[in-house]
């Protein structure tokens, strides 16, 4: 259990947590008949007796309640995931039909476009993660669903009119909701499906894997639908309008979950840190929130900071490759026509189809077998083979796409399944996922824009079109080569400093948690000033770099032969 005192709190100073001391606390009393009775207030961060409750989650929840949660929560990212998957498929058409200041856009501008939804998420998740912890995920998710729907509308209008700036504006609006709503999902899953000493081993790994798998289904739809729809209607942008319709459906499901949660008894509801402060003035809310934000940041364990610092730019390397895969197949193995685009899109669908089945199995495997650290190196090796075969050989694209699908299956699940183990307090879960999302968004922005710029540079240096991806591939392969070595690094860290939590099965973890009580798994599973400062400084630097790269390539006119690079 993490220390309640921040490493930055001065002796005798008042901790920001004291600003949020609840007027009443959740308690469990035994009545004369031996039944369990809960108070009317949900668990709130503040007292020592609350700590166990905020780590347990929805104790005694029925499977009917859990099924309702799953069916409404899984679809919250429907519209966003579909649209993000459709953009890479439509890259050849985007380059031919989208204008900036009267010029067709180039590959660097396309990189700006695909990373626009990430731009706001270089900063927003730091705060939205705390917002999810402070106010609960349901209403935050409803706001995010609204942003996604409006963003999809603006993006579709921009595509219809061929306006680069309008498409970017829609992407940014969609980005405001996309990452934050996923944090809301993860917070909800951790509350309802995390194992405890009361209910026994949970199914968090399985549910997390199933969430990732259903996201792959939405991505599969985004990969398969746009090309046939374009062929049937003669309009390349109709696939994006379908994403707007899906986002409206997701918004309606989010509203259903909010209404469902209001019917639950207080002990079933997710812990909120400011439940009793709803009547504060706006300024008091701001100052209290900033205090809570800082308190959450400094209580994040060192192991979590180490995890995201080591993985810096790795997600961006994958995003840079994936956003260009369809165009890479067309350029290196096909012709510049709708038939080649349609064929490439079908092959690209393997990227989503295979993980639909395998991802839940991987998540369940982590619950039953452990060894999340080993999956990181295996994932990197799959990507190295996929990228090398796709970019530097003429083998049938199905072969590299098969390796790509296996890599994509393992890409995020080990980290999503590990974060709740390193960050044991429920009221810090949103903050931790927010920091992780912000780091990933910054890395994706930098790497996607850099990848597009390297493609344009290759063309300007006289490389033939079929070799325009060489420079970008050299960059991303370097990062994946490093990641292949990280499994051994994580094994050593986990064994010595993390208490073996990455290698444990869910059953072993619950048993050890019962033995440790409030003690930490390992020496780095609690806050350390050095790692907190290093993480915060790195956050500022990578966010500044992301904004600098993005703005520079947004306002720069396309070079030489726009749209043909």
PLM region descriptions:
Residues 68-100, 321-326, 416:
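Extracytoplasmic
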